């Protein structure tokens, strides 16, 4: 049985980890931490968890003694120093602190210096692309939600050199839970309900993460123009991607079917069928559709994920499974909730 700890257990991704891991046949939650609710039982704060473990302040000695793996479900910049205090524990960080190959990129976009970063054996935790490296990883940087939807949608096309990577346009829409569990006027019901708006246009911090991984796939310079939008729903991301090509839709579709043929969570839809966020609600599944705009030779790719599952906690559990030599679908086999 894998002994599991969660730091940040009362945020949305932390709570999703609790939900998934309580139903995992090979995992046992042995440590839960929350600075805000330390000293309380989790079910006192969130009765829906049915979890009577007592939340505590972060204690590296207790984590090292009681956990085989630790999930850090904290905002960017909060995990790095905590993780460096631990010994003999595998780490899966759901923030951005371990996602970048170059710490200078993190410093530029997140405003923090990561001292000693070059000494950490870390892997970018997108299983469909880095499965072999994840198997032996000590620290996994779990991908961001938007990058997961965009990278998986583009990977086959870039790998097979089917599209022009020079300029990739991404229009993405996310439910409000993607912003995390925090008090901010922008996320009040009256502000979000019956409204659709863009945010962080041309400056979202997920852009360098997308470009890093897409360039590794293509072997070429990639430029992503990314506009995210907030939509009045709780969960889900739908990314629509526009990229130039001189290939036929049939050839591209066949390449996608082949690329993802053995992937348990990635589903390439038949031509003419387009994905919906409702299809992956509460699950680790990804749905990818495509269409060709013949007049301009533009391939239009569409991908749908649940931002809290495949975009965060589900993918983290998938990474844990790989790190401990389990079938990566363990604890994640359930179908989406519909309607």
Swiss-Prot record:
One of the record's GO cellular component terms:
cytoplasm
> Where along the chain is the active site annotated?
145
Give yes or no: UniProt keyword Zinc-finger: no
Q: Give the signal peptide, or none.
A: none
Where found, per UniProt? Cytoplasm
Q: Where are the disulfide bridges? A: none
Pathway assigned in UniProt:
Amino-acid biosynthesis; L-arginine biosynthesis; N(2)-acetyl-L-ornithine from L-glutamate: step 3/4
Q: Which CDD domains match?
A: AGPR_1_C, AGPR_1_N
Q: Which InterPro entries match?
A: AGPR_AS, AGPR_type-1, NAD(P)-bd_dom_sf, NAGSA_dehydrogenase, Semialdehyde_DH_NAD-bd
Q: Which family does it belong to?
A: Belongs to the NAGSA dehydrogenase family. Type 1 subfamily.
Q: What is this protein called?
A: N-acetyl-gamma-glutamyl-phosphate reductase
């Amino acid at each position: 049985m894998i002994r599991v700890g969660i730091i940040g257990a009362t945020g949305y991704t932390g709570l999703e980890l609790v939900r998934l891991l309580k139903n995992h046949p090979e995992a046992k939650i042995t440590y839960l931490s929350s600075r805000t609710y330390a000293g309380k039982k989790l079910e006192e704060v969130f009765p829906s968890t049915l979890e009577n473990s007592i939340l505590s302040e972060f204690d590296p000695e207790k984590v090292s003694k009681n956990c085989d793996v630790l999930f850090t479900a904290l905002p960017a910049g909060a995990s790095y120093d905590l993780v460096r205090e631990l010994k003999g524990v595998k780490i899966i960080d759901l923030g951005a602190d371990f996602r970048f190959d170059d710490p200078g990129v993190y410093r530029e976009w997140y405003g923090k210096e990561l001292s000693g970063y070059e000494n950490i054996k870390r892997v970018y935790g997108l299983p469909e692309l880095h499965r072999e490296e994840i198997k032996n990883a000590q620290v996994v940087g779990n991908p961001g939600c938007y990058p997961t939807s965009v990278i998986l949608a583009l990977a086959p096309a870039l790998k097979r050199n089917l599209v022009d990577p020079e300029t990739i346009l991404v229009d993405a829409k996310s439910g409000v839970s993607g912003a995390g569990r925090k008090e901010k006027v922008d996320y009040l019901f009256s502000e979000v309900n019956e409204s659709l708006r863009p945010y962080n246009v041309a400056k979202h911090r997920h852009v360098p993460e997308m470009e890093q991984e897409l360039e590794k796939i293509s072997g070429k310079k990639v430029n992503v123009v990314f506009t995210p939008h907030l939509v009045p729903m709780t969960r889900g991301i739908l990314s629509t991607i526009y990229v130039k090509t001189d290939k036929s839709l049939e050839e591209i579709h066949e390449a996608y079917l082949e690329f993802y043929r053995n992937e348990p969570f990635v589903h390439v839809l038949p031509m003419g069928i387009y994905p919906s966020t409702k299809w992956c609600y509460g699950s680790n599944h990804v749905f990818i559709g495509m269409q060709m705009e013949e007049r301009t030779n533009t391939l239009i790719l569409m991908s749908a994920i649940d931002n809290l599952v495949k975009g965060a906690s589900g993918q983290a559990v998938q990474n844990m499974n790989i790190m401990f030599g389990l079938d990566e679908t363990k604890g994640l086999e359930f179908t989406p909730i519909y309607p």
